[in-house]
Amino acid sequence: MMTLLIAAISTPAQAAPVAAKPTDRIVFLGDSITQGGAGPKGYVTLVRQKLGDGDAKGAEVIGAGISGNKVPDLEKRLERDVLSKKPTVVVIYIGINDVWHGERDPAKGTMPDRFEQGLGGIVEKIQAAGARVILATPSVIGEKKGGANKLDAKLDQYSEITRKLAKDKKTGLCDLRKAFADQLAKANGADKEAGILTTDRVHLNEAGNAFVAGEMLKALGK
């Protein structure tokens, strides 16, 4: 009972969706996963199509992903690529490179305290501009189950930072880290390192893009 209570307090996975409306301008901010998500079968495109078929028809969906980006990069281009577009909703899917790039040289990644400070500041600036925010936890660097991937513990740490910020800043949450773990536990019977939801342990294949689109739509109340 105590374990369940602690989990409920520490993981705000039941955060209320940021319901998309026909008048919304939604910006997806992130790295190469989001850049690729703007392609023909990418998750950003799939979200746009789904919203266009439903009660949020008319909502504008903009991809703002750049390959290799980490939190400090988002800080530098926030005004140009996000705030200047006058969004009403901003979805931030970041953290993979903050962990991955620091695997061999910590100076090339983003330390946890810097990640928290930077991401929190980005959220505050977006909220000050009047937009709602959805934070997405970083998904995977390797698809093996049960914490067997080399950087799983680090990704879990950065995901927990993201969940905490979502709770503290009262944002929406798309907990991709948990969603991927749950899906791979069911779908990765051969315990493969890649090929279920990713092409290369990180970047999404067609199934992965469809999966992320579904999770994002849930966070958008669809």
Predicted regions and their residues:
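A structural signal for the hydrophobic beta-strands that form the central parallel beta-sheet
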Residues: 28-29, 63, 135, 198
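Membrane/wall-proximal cationic-aromatic binding patches
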Residues: 14-28
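Catalytic nucleophile-elbow at a beta strand-turn-alpha helix junction centered on a G-D-S/GDSL motif
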Residues: 24-39, 67-70, 99
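A short beta-strand-loop structural module common to alpha/beta enzyme folds
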Residues: 54-70
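Alpha-helical cap/lid subdomain in secreted, periplasmic
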Residues: 20-21, 46-57, 73-222
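Short Gly/aromatic-enriched secondary-structure transition segments
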Residues: 41-45
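Bacterial N-terminal signal peptides
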Residues: 1-10
